[in-house]
Swiss-Prot record:
Origin: domain of life: Bacteria
SUPFAM superfamilies recorded: Glycoside hydrolase/deacetylase
Protein name, entry field: Chitooligosaccharide deacetylase
Record's GO cellular component terms: cytoplasm
Quaternary structure and partners: Homodimer.
Annotated family: Belongs to the YdjC deacetylase family. ChbG subfamily.
Pathway, per record: Glycan degradation; chitin degradation
PANTHER family the record matches: CARBOHYDRATE DEACETYLASE, YDJC DEACETYLASE FAMILY MEMBER
Encoding gene (name): chbG
Species of the source: Citrobacter koseri (strain ATCC BAA-895 / CDC 4225-83 / SGSC4696)
Localization per Swiss-Prot or TrEMBL: Cytoplasm
């Protein structure tokens, strides 16, 4: 049985090094898809780069934890910036959901303005769209627009609660991440998905060349290791050998 594999590189637009790494992993590796932070420092560079890489599917990486929002968000920002305090606010059930909904709409429109088309799908920086309070907002938004959505079905959600019109892969893995990146780890993710009987799988990744912005990230040098693994000829062969076809969210 042929299975669909979506290898999605998060953080398009974060920095030029990130952008170049994603494009390299698409042109010479197994990355098929990416998601863009429309408030990223290098988002204009990302939009320009992808014009020369038509096979790279581009979705939107909804941002509520980094940089400046596109709208006034007094209930979520501190000194005008987004940050990881959103986790505490979620636990305290004090998230400004109206502000978040409006910011989602504005980031979506900004994506269209930048890339000249709608995103292939939606996900989010640090998976904040999977918060129980935020997920219904993003899921309904995606369903109404016919846009696919990253869903981690294993961790949080009851599939019966999903909007009928919502498209997603059957499986999602964030396990190709950390200090132990290797081809073997990537293939373990695929084998585990196959054992669960999933017909489609998204694997998250973050391939990048190191620059000054990436150096400031808590997740820095493993991004370069990811790039090495994702561009190895042996990985592409092993994926095909396992019966996976590389594709994007346009295929789900």
């Amino acid at each position: 049985m042929e299975r669909l594999l979506i290898v999605n590189a998060d953080d398009f637009g974060l920095s030029k090094g990130q952008n170049y790494g994603i494009v390299e992993a698409c042109r010479n590796g197994v990355v098929t898809s990416t998601t863009a932070l429309v408030n990223g420092d290098a988002i204009d560079h990302a939009a320009q780069l992808c014009r020369d890489v038509p096979k790279l599917a581009v979705g939107m990486h909804f941002v509520l934890t980094l940089g400046k929002p596109l709208t006034a968000m007094p209930g979520l920002t501190r000194e005008g910036l987004l940050g990881k305090w959103i986790w505490q606010m979620a636990e305290e059930e004090t998230l400004p959901l109206d502000e978040i909904s409006h910011e989602l709409e504005c980031q979506y429109q900004r994506f269209i303005d930048l890339f000249g088309r709608e995103p292939t799908h939606l996900d989010s920086h640090h998976h904040v769209h999977m918060f129980p309070q935020i997920f219904p907002i993003v899921a309904m938004f995606a369903a109404e627009r016919g846009v696919a959505l990253r869903i981690d079905r294993q961790s949080v959600l009851n599939a019966d609660d999903l909007p009928v019109a919502l498209r997603s892969s059957q499986g999602f893995s964030s396990e190709f991440y950390g200090d132990a990146i290797s081809e073997a780890l990537f293939l373990q993710v695929l084998d585990a998905s196959a054992d669960r009987g999933e017909k489609s799988l998204e694997v998250m990744c973050h391939p990048a060349f190191i620059d000054n912005i990436i150096r400031q990230s808590a997740y820095c040098y493993p991004r370069l290791t990811e790039l090495d693994v994702l561009t190895s000829a042996s990985l592409k062969y092993a994926i095909a050998e396992r019966g996976y076809r590389l594709g994007s969210f346009l295929d789900v």
